[in-house]
């Protein structure tokens, strides 16, 4: 059954994931994603840099259903995603799944520099609207050195326009996607792993 609880307090709502540097986080659990949200509503995932993952960079949605779910108005914009899906397959820089209501957007993301793993028996994608994905506007995403720009698998109603290697505003997207200048120092932090 699609996840759409009558108690709306159970739904992850209005979360913001912004200005994060997420790099090399899938070493132990290769099927993990840089950022993953199962059934969010009104989530904002923006201005992040996600890189060096063994599977998908950003994943939003679950359930493989065209029926109404708790998801609506999800925003995945202005992210810089590169060197992802390095070992596994059937993933993407940005992967979305199932009916996501209305008003969801995937815009002005810069997806670049990755290829299908030599161990994979199936491809990977820049943007992947998987089974029953609906409710999205997918526009102005720049994809450079990407084996497949956009894949759509049994999707519902979406608006997909002006994406690829030269969408309108490509130079601006390249310059502004990812971590905003006021948070750039996050990439210089050194974190010492705990010793077990």
Label each PLM-derived region with a short phrase.
Residues 60, 116-118, 147-150:
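Noncatalytic linker/hinge segments flanking ATPase motor cores
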Residues 8, 18, 118, 132, ...:
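Context-gated lysine
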Residues 1-3, 7-26, 41-55, 68-85, ...:
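Right-handed parallel beta-helix
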Residues 104, 145-146, 150-196:
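Acidic, glycine- and Ser/Thr-rich low-complexity intrinsically disordered tracts
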Residues 62, 131, 152-154:
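A cross-domain feature marking catalytic cores of carbohydrate-active enzymes
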Residues 33-36, 59, 63, 103-105, ...:
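Compositionally biased, intrinsically disordered low-complexity regions
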